[in-house]
Amino acid sequence: MVVLGSTGSIGKNALKIAKKFGIEIEALSCGKNIALINEQIQVFKPKKVAILDPSDLNDLEPLGAEVFVGLEGIDAMIEECTSNLVLNAIVGVAGLKASFKSLQRNKKLALANKESLVSAGHLLDISQITPIDSEHFGLWALLQNKTLKPKSLIISASGGAFRDTPLEFIPIQNAQNALKHPNWSMGSKITIDSASMVNKLFEILETYWLFGASLKIDALIERSSIVHALVEFEDNSIIAHLASADMQLPISYAIDPKLASLSASIKPLDLYALSAIKFEPISMERYTLWCYKDLLLENPKLGVVLNASNEVAMEKFLNKEIAFGGLIQTISQALESYDKMPFKLSSLEEVLELDKEVRERFKNVAGV
């Protein structure tokens, strides 16, 4: 298999599972963590390696592997790989081209890069994609029951770092506080997306493309991150998917469902410890971006605008140029600006063009 973004949280877990399953790693790619990819090269002996920045070439120790550089290099590497499976754990819209290239080459795509579906779900062959996400894995598992007819799909949110912060203090929060996730250990972008509820807007759009534009789609807060997804059926019964908060479960099924079903990759649940589970609505007062959920479901191509404005605002937030309120404000302004515009977006080039336009337009918006 090929692992793109091998030095991140998902990538590291994927390599752990590949080793457990005895799967050979043909190629690896990383962004800036050259020290870690050097370690991974020693353990997994890939035939090909891609790094983002040519200035890191001197520090790379490829041990005879063919080396590729930049986003174009990742594309060229995928083109040459013979593996049937590509796991895309690249963060941000940078991973979009890699998803397209993998599907063009008729490879199975294990997808942790949310931005691919959020920005271009209408252009991707969903039948070749397995999402790496606890909520979508939960929905997939629940929808295996073909006798019952689904009516609505519900995914859960933890509430993120500011779920108990007094409302008046939320706009002035900094990145350091936003990174204190109550349940999950994840990369910085997805942890902050969890605090803003952008992550759940992403997952709502992913659900739309993956499982059914015709079904009602919603989310709720379940603080323990034990209930990942629920499906309500036409007979008004509801089935929930419960599992420990551990990404190794969806990763293992994305890599090899058969092997994943034969052995445990996560610790068992203690049912007697689950008495505290309760469901809460997502408050628009606390999570102001949640008010755009219905707009995004009505016009899912707005996902390009959501993602581009979020990435621009995220960079400024992490660089301490704006506070949390400024991040929210930038995304709101972007969605309000584009919500009446008709989008065709009939090619990857058009998606990337709109992405670039939104970034240019909102990179200098003054924030809180």
Swiss-Prot record:
Entry's Gene Ontology molecular function annotations: 1-deoxy-D-xylulose-5-phosphate reductoisomerase activity; manganese ion binding; NADPH binding
Class of enzymatic activity (EC top level): oxidoreductase
Keyword set includes Metal-binding: yes
Amino acids binding NADPH: 7-10, 31-33, 113, 115, 187
EC number annotated for this UniProt entry: 1.1.1.267
HAMAP family attached to this UniProt entry: DXP_reductoisom (MF_00183)
Protein name (database record): 1-deoxy-D-xylulose 5-phosphate reductoisomerase
Protein's organism: Helicobacter pylori (strain ATCC 700392 / 26695) (Campylobacter pylori)
